[in-house]
Amino acid sequence: MDSTNARSGMKSRKKKPKTTVIDEDDCMTCSVCQSKLVKISDITKVSLDYINTMRGNTLACTACGSSLKLLNDFAS
């Protein structure tokens, strides 16, 4: 039996593209708006004028305005 005969009358489905993570592009994202954050290795290549620091280790995401903390800061 030919595969074209077995599918007659059936609609063909589009395959979903596979998401692959490229190591160079593998950086953390904001948990609220999913915008990409600066990697520590890129810190010398990027202008830091857009980073809003709050108090201590807390940063503010410029895309959505949410405050970003380290996980160990929640325990204290």
Curated annotation (Swiss-Prot):
The entry's keywords: Host cytoplasm, Host nucleus, Phosphoprotein, Virion
Domain of life: Viruses
InterPro entries xrefs: Poxvirus_A19 (IPR007769)
GO cellular component terms, A-Z: host cell cytoplasm; host cell nucleus; virion component
Subcellular location per the Swiss-Prot or TrEMBL entry: Virion; Host cytoplasm; Host nucleus
Primary localization class, coarse: virion
Coiled-coil residue spans: none
Similarity annotation: Belongs to the orthopoxvirus OPG146 family.
Subunit structure: Interacts with capping enzyme RAP94/OPG109, the two large RNA polymerase subunits RPO147/OPG105 and RPO132/OPG151, the two early transcription factor subunits OPG185 and OPG133, one of the capping enzyme subunits OPG113, the nucleoside triphosphate phosphohydrolase OPG123, two core proteins OPG129 and OPG138, and a virion protein OPG064.
Function: Plays a role in the maturation of immature virions to infectious particles. May also participate in viral transcription.
Name of the protein this chain belongs to: Protein OPG146
Organism: Variola virus (isolate Human/India/Ind3/1967) (VARV)
Name of the coding gene: OPG146
